[in-house]
Amino acid sequence: MAKQLLFEDHARARMLAGVEKLAKAVATTMGPTGRNVIIDKSFGGPTVTKDGVTVAKEIELEDRFENMGAKLVIEVAQKTSDLAGDGTTTATVLARAIFKEGLRNIVAGSNPTAIRRGIEKAVEAACDQLVEMGRPVSGKQEVAHVGAISANNDNVIGELLADALERVGKDGVITVEEGKSRNTEVEYVDGMQFDKGYVSPYFITDSSTMEASLEDALVLLYEKKVSNIRDLVPLLEKTAQTGQPLLIIAEDVDAEALTLLVVNKLRGTLNVCAVKAPGFGDRRKAMLGDIATLTGGTLISEDLGMQLENVTLEHLGRAKKVTVDKSNTTIVEGAGKREDIDKRVAQIRAQIEQTDSDYDKEKFQERLAKLAGGVAVISVGAETEAEMKQTKARLEDALHATRAAVEEGILPGGGVALVHCREAVEAAKKKAKGDEKIGVDIVLGALDAPMRQIADNGGIDGSVVVDEVLQKNDPKIGFNAHTGEYTDMVKAGVIDPVKVVRTALTNAASIAGLLLTTEALVTNFEQEDKDKRPVEGMVS
């Protein structure tokens, strides 16, 4: 199949046209006075949103060359959102500003590669300054402010996330799911919970709640399937003598062994409950190890030469309370030693650092939360499905942003932090050579783009606002578009996580540099394109 090609300035100009169209649509949502964007759907009614990444995802341009430029910036906006939870609009606005000014200089005869090097040096200096300007989050209220700003100034979402983070801790897991009512609710799970329930309903102790409740329980952790009754009987006899209930967690329990357990339960000889071990393969073994650490027990594993028939009471874990329902098991207040739990937590943290897989990271984080933190499940409620999906997306963004704030600290918001990186970038210019200086100047001019855009969306001249903020000469003072006043942004609750601003700038500069050093575009012909006149500069 024949391809159509576009070269040099013609190629870059078409990509810029695509980036401009994308940025114009996305940038209108920026700031507290940002406007709504209405997106037509192929089914159902139109979606009304003020979320930059939602708008970006929907954009598909008719012109293939323009679409290539737009799609590359959309990818960067999405990557910024995935990494930091917010900053998609900021990244798009910065990418447009850097690419547009860079292209103007390249057309005038500057060296694209040198400009890109200059951009990279300037961004490195700006990021170092951002990290230096940042400070740790102090208190629940600042976490709430970060969440609210990320969720398009929704204070309810900010407060909700601040409460959840305070409850589960920084190592805790917060999951957001679609609810079944009109109200948004938060459910907290204390202790360790995993998604496996009782293997037989005969283990239930409370028929009103359909739960098996074991107080001051002993916990047997067995890696294999419980199949031989003779192996199990000695342990059951020892456990019955203590008068304590027994929780058995194993790969599976076969019919014969299950019958033995159920008969003992129904006769009142022993309060017992059996559940399948969570996870699969190596992950199952790791999770059983976590439960062993939490309860102070030993994982009975044939790899270690241990047999079920030789298990004594010393090998069993202990927990103050165990609750088992049809699909979940919750272990509260295990008897594990604090130092052993801390070692296990440190080991999981090291694994999180070492892995490159997002899926593995998520699973490690879940294990960490169950050992060191807690779990909060936010069920999003709304009047309509469209509203629910929008609220859920905003909640997820805000959750990432609040975690980013706790991780790397916070900065004054509203584009103030970027504007006050000018001195650091100007210092970097002294070390630049030749056309690299132009690259540094391009970043210098782009740093105020987010503040200009926020002001423009509020109906105020962005250039005037930037000049006014620079004249104040105070890194905390900025323009609060919500009130229309110049104020201390941190005190006003207008704050951004360091990670969000830093990631947005780094990603924007990266894609702009890539676009500026692009020399050729290659794409397929569309059927109808054959009847159109060739575009100037196009070779086919």
From Swiss-Prot:
Main location, first listed in the record: cytoplasm
Pfam family name, one: Cpn60_TCP1
Database matches in Gene3D superfamilies: GroEL (3.50.7.10), GroEL-like equatorial domain (1.10.560.10), TCP-1-like chaperonin intermediate domain (3.30.260.10)
Domain of life: Bacteria
Catalysed reaction equations from the record: ATP + H2O + a folded polypeptide = ADP + phosphate + an unfolded polypeptide
Entries under InterPro entries matching the protein: Chaperonin_Cpn60_CS, Cpn60/GroEL, Cpn60/GroEL/TCP-1, GroEL-like_apical_dom_sf, GROEL-like_equatorial_sf, TCP-1-like_intermed_sf
UniProt binding sites for ATP: T29, M30, G31, P32, K50, D86, G87, T88, T89, T90, G414, D496
Enzyme class: isomerase
Entries under SUPFAM superfamilies matching the protein: GroEL apical domain-like, GroEL equatorial domain-like, GroEL-intermediate domain like
GO aspect biological process, one term: protein refolding
NCBIfam families on file: GroEL (TIGR02348), PRK00013.1 (NF000592), PRK12849.1 (NF009487), PRK12850.1 (NF009488), PRK12851.1 (NF009489)
Function: Together with its co-chaperonin GroES, plays an essential role in assisting protein folding. The GroEL-GroES system forms a nano-cage that allows encapsulation of the non-native substrate proteins and provides a physical environment optimized to promote and accelerate protein folding.
Assembly mode: Forms a cylinder of 14 subunits composed of two heptameric rings stacked back-to-back. Interacts with the co-chaperonin GroES.
Record protein name field: Chaperonin GroEL 2
Organism annotation: Rhodopirellula baltica (strain DSM 10527 / NCIMB 13988 / SH1)
Upper taxonomic lineage: Bacteria, Pseudomonadati, Planctomycetota, Planctomycetia, Pirellulales
